[in-house]
């Protein structure tokens, strides 16, 4: 994607905002090369040219690509454990208006996409705008199509922009957006392009903060917009994997056709063998007469076949290092011990690091989702966030258990809790723990209410 804008030349754009927008463009452009590199490693598109040590792999094979899914695994396995399930208040009750916003924006399905982008590049962004049909429109954006400036004093973004129109397939990334939203504390500036000319339209709002919220993974004081899961040590281990698999592949080729030798033959016999190498390799018989010049009998032999075991051992070592660096289990990165299979309890113990990381991810993303929910409610009701009532302000994001225990385990725990705590079996939490989805729970509650209604009618009729 190409983004070429001179902010001061945009028709109708405030000069102060044009200066901040230029800073945003500088930030966005400075991150594009690194983001593109992380995208390549996520997609497994790593060529031998960038990993070759120049010892065992010929330079001519630099363009060869070896597939590696470790970059994808680093992101997707953790993202799969962050399962957003909607919003509830502190009493555990849902908000009908907020449920409608979640459903209309398909947030439960869109969140995993935003989470993967967040883990891949360090952050992703949610933007909000008023919508006459559904009240509030919520969209998620990758760091490749959005950028923001951080306000350290307020602990949130100062301003940001997001590309609104969808990217088109063009050669060499030549596509240029034609619609960009620029978000400030008091307005959304809509920047639209007609040919090579840009114009700006200001849409004021009363939120008092940009209608843009980042989802940030593992932020630090020096990196408020977080860090990618595909960081430098991870990329180096992926390079080691690609290099080792390439060496193993080449070694296997030589093992398939081990080197042979034939001594004491005439020049004619030598030429015949050299000119028909493949035929001599696959043939069942190799015949040669005594050398009439020397009287020697030809001697045939084969050098020791290559061994692929060192390459396999190296892959296991790399997988173990990768597991430690990423928090994934060694099973996730492809190391399986068939001779002594890992028990389910051992696998669960190995995944505790990943579960802890998922809980931390849910906590930080939960705060961002709560802010998004409050802004969405405020936009829908035409008020500021400060004007929301206390019940609305108590909204929190709900996530499923990142440990992903089996239904049998959670059901057993639920039954034990119900036996010790009176009334627990009547709650929605109990039904969730024994394996029912929110849709099933609603159907169960509706049918229970219908049954109670029929019973009440029967009592009235009998009396």
Where are the model-predicted features located?
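Extended, regular secondary-structure scaffolds
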Residues: 125-230
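Extended, helix-rich architectural segments
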Residues: 1-141, 145, 460-463
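Extended, charged amphipathic alpha-helical segments
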Residues: 201-349, 388, 398-402
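Long, highly charged low-complexity segments enriched in Glu/Asp and Lys/Arg with interspersed Ser/Thr
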Residues: 434-461
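Active/binding-pocket-proximal capping segment
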Residues: 322, 336-343, 375, 379, ...
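Extended amphipathic alpha-helical segments with heptad-repeat/coiled-coil character used for oligomerization
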Residues: 367, 380-416
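Hydrophobic, well-ordered secondary-structure elements that form the walls
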Residues: 322, 369, 430
């Amino acid at each position: 994607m190409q983004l070429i804008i001179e902010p001061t030349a945009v028709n109708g754009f405030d000069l102060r905002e044009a200066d901040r927008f230029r800073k945003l463009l500088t930030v966005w452009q400075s991150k594009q090369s690194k983001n593109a590199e992380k995208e390549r490693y996520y997609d497994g598109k790593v060529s031998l040219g960038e990993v070759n040590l120049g010892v065992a792999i010929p330079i001519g094979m630099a363009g060869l690509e070896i597939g590696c899914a470790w970059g994808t695994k680093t992101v997707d396995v953790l993202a799969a454990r962050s399962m957003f399930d909607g919003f509830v208040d502190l009493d555990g009750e849902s908000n009908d208006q907020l449920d409608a916003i979640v459903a209309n924006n398909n947030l439960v399905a869109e969140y995993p996409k935003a989470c993967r982008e967040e883990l891949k590049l360090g952050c992703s962004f949610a933007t909000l705008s008023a919508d006459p049909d559904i009240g509030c429109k919520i969209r998620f954006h990758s760091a490749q199509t959005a950028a923001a400036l951080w306000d350290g004093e307020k602990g949130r973004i100062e301003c940001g922009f997001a590309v609104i129109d969808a990217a088109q397939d063009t050669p060499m990334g030549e596509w240029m957006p034609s619609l960009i939203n620029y978000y400030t504390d008091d307005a959304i500036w809509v920047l639209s392009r007609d040919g090579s000319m840009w114009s700006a339209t200001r849409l004021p709002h009363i939120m008092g903060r940009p209608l843009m919220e980042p989802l940030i993974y593992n932020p630090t004081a020096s990196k408020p917009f977080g860090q990618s899961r595909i960081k430098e040590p991870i990329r180096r281990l992926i390079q080691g994997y690609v290099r080792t698999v390439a060496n193993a592949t080449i070694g296997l080729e030589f093992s398939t056709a081990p080197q042979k030798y034939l001594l004491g033959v005439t020049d004619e016999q030598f030429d015949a063998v050299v000119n028909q190498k493949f035929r001599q390799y696959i043939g069942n018989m190799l015949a040669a007469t005594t050398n009439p010049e020397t009287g020697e009998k030809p001697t045939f032999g084969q050098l020791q076949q290559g061994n692929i075991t060192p390459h396999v051992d190296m892959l296991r070592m790399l997988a173990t290092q990768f597991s430690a660096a990423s928090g994934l289990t060694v099973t996730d990165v492809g190391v399986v011990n068939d001779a002594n299979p890992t028990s389910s309890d051992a696998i669960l113990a190995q995944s505790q690091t990943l579960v802890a990381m998922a809980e931390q991810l849910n906590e930080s993303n939960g705060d961002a989702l709560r802010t998004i929910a409050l802004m969405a409610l405020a936009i829908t009701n035409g008020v500021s966030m400060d004007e929301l009532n206390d019940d609305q302000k108590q909204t929190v994001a709900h996530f499923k258990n990142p440990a992903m225990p089996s239904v049998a385990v959670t059901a057993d725990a639920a039954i034990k809790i119900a036996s010790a705590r009176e009334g627990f079996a009547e709650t929605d939490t109990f039904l969730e723990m024994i394996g029912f989805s929110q849709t099933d729970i609603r159907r169960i509650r509706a049918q229970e209410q219908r049954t109670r209604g029929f019973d009440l009618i029967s009592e009235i009729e009998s009396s």
